[in-house]
UniProtKB/Swiss-Prot annotation:
Segments of skewed composition (Low complexity): 29-39
Residue ranges with Polar residues bias: 157-174
GO cellular component, one term: U2-type spliceosomal complex
Protein name: Pre-mRNA-splicing factor CWC26
Keyword terms: Coiled coil, Cytoplasm, mRNA processing, mRNA splicing, Nucleus, Spliceosome
Superkingdom of the source species: Eukaryota
Principal location: cytoplasm
Subunit structure: Associated with the spliceosome.
A UniProt-annotated Pfam family: Bud13
Residues forming coiled coils: 76-124
Amino acid sequence: MDEYLAKKYGSKPKKTKKRKLVEGLDVDTAPITQRQTQQAPPPPRAKGGWKTLSGKAIDPVEETVYRDASGNIISVDDQISVLQQRQQEKEAAERRKKENLLGAVQVEEARKRQAKEEAMKHTKVTVHADDKEYNEERQNRAIYADPAAKFGKATPKASTTSSGGALPSYTGSFPSNRFNIKPGCLWDGNDRSNGFEAKWLSRQEEMKRQADVDYQNEMDF
């Protein structure tokens, strides 16, 4: 009827709004949240990726399989832990090697320095004039060519080792020297001096022997 009247009188037909029913529910009158639940989820889109030689798509969640030279499957986590353990053993061996080259005093000083650095992590940064520990450290510190050092109290000598014993020394035979100093425990036995000590000792013995001869000659006369 509307189309007939439009053709006859030239008026446009009224557009009727069509309503869709989704499972007996009016779309225009349904709440928005209810409309979203009624809509079907979109189909998953095919994603591009790597494919095998046979054309089969590779699942991106599959883990890469690693093999060694003989073809056995290896675990990456196990290999990382083994490499870390080897690195730690190497660092420990190098640290022991460096400690063996040092004397007992140097090792003790390094240990005390490390303990002091660890203790400083929990100490306060600010230092006041009445700080007892800092004042004792400053007072016990030896100062070169201090003219007033002899008037103060005697500073306690640091122990040579942690147990208070003597330092290790060379147990074999060694060339004599004028100060009678024994070589260290790490000495390889090679005399690398220029021969001055031997000449000096020989000259001292010769002078002493000549003095004895002169004394005997004086007594004979």
